[in-house]
Amino acid sequence: MIEIDGSYGEGGGQLVRTAVALSAVTGEEIKVTNIRENRPNPGLKQQHLKALETAAKICGARVSGLSQGSSELFFAPVEIKGGKYNIDIGTAGSITLLLQCIMPALPFVEEKVELTIRGGTDVAWSPTIDYLKHVTLRALEQFGYAGSVTLKERGYYPRGGGSVSAVFEPCKLHGFHFRKTEGNKKTESNPVGEGLKGEKSMMEEIIGVSHASNLPAHVPARQAESARSLFLEAGYDARIDVSSSEFFSTGSGITLWKGYCGGSALGKKGLPAEKVGRQAAEEVIKELRAGAAVDIHLADQLIPYMALAGNSSFTVRELTLHAATNIWVTEQFLDVKFKIKEKEGLFEVSVG
């Protein structure tokens, strides 16, 4: 049995999710203690419980400590099983964080896994559904990962009610080295518009979606226009789709991406739409100007997949505590050792 100190490093829910996912992959029983010990409300929260319940169901695990506020968790997996699963997280619990708890295990199923999940698609402190679809899953495809998500209905805090369907196929993972594209880092010797015909649109265009539910149509339009204006000032083209809907919950947000760098922001009462768009755009510009292969959020998500795939690497502008913690957890389960070195003002993370 592997024992994990849940207060190590970043000490949050991600540590538990990664530990459970790798327990499912390796078949190792785990005991996680001191869960979220240093947080204002320690122990497991409601949204953690749904993710852990789902993981237990998919791999037939014996579990104890699955209650709100619990500081210890025992998880003993049996076999990862495919099939169809319907999950209702309740209110606005994050759909993407639930998926984060099970996705590393799904390449090893015997048959495909089909999920229908209700909860929050665009909520604070978690990747948005658009980021998962257009950045995370696109990056995982480079390892041979076979998964897709389809947005049915957006769910915002506090009511949630969003709906997503997801399909994951058995697959064999292989290593991949993420390299920055020349369009990521702009210098005087590489101004916008120079190079091969068509290169500007291919290398420089940022894609995005600005959305709102039960709000005036000008809200997502203003978010998009604010982001687009900032990108133009910075020398980037941007194509941002705008959608206005009437879903169960009320809210707005914007997600922007280029390659393996993304950024997002959520609207809230009293926050002008222009500030929402600007916040997301600033995040993307910061990542692109750093010239790294992946953004700081994708970096920590890639860690367990790199270890499972072998012989992989990326560069990132900053090694966050989330990423360092994920490396530590992953090394507890798998016979791998990550290497980290500073290179040209960036951090290069490699394994295998």
Swiss-Prot record:
- Source superkingdom: Archaea
Compartments reported by the entry: Cytoplasm
Instruction: Please give the CDD domains that the UniProt record associates with this protein.
Output: RNA_Cyclase_Class_II
* Catalysis: reaction(s): a 3'-end 3'-phospho-ribonucleotide-RNA + ATP = a 3'-end 2',3'-cyclophospho-ribonucleotide-RNA + AMP + diphosphate
GO cellular component terms given for this protein: cytoplasm
Q: Which UniProt keywords apply?
A: ATP-binding, Cytoplasm, Ligase, Nucleotide-binding
Provide the binding site for ATP. Q100, H297, L298, A299, D300, Q301
Q: Which family does it belong to?
A: Belongs to the RNA 3'-terminal cyclase family. Type 1 subfamily.
What name does this protein carry?
RNA 3'-terminal phosphate cyclase
The record lists the organism as Methanosarcina mazei (strain ATCC BAA-159 / DSM 3647 / Goe1 / Go1 / JCM 11833 / OCM 88)
Q: What is the lineage of its organism?
A: Archaea, Methanobacteriati, Methanobacteriota, Stenosarchaea group, Methanomicrobia
Gene behind this protein: rtcA
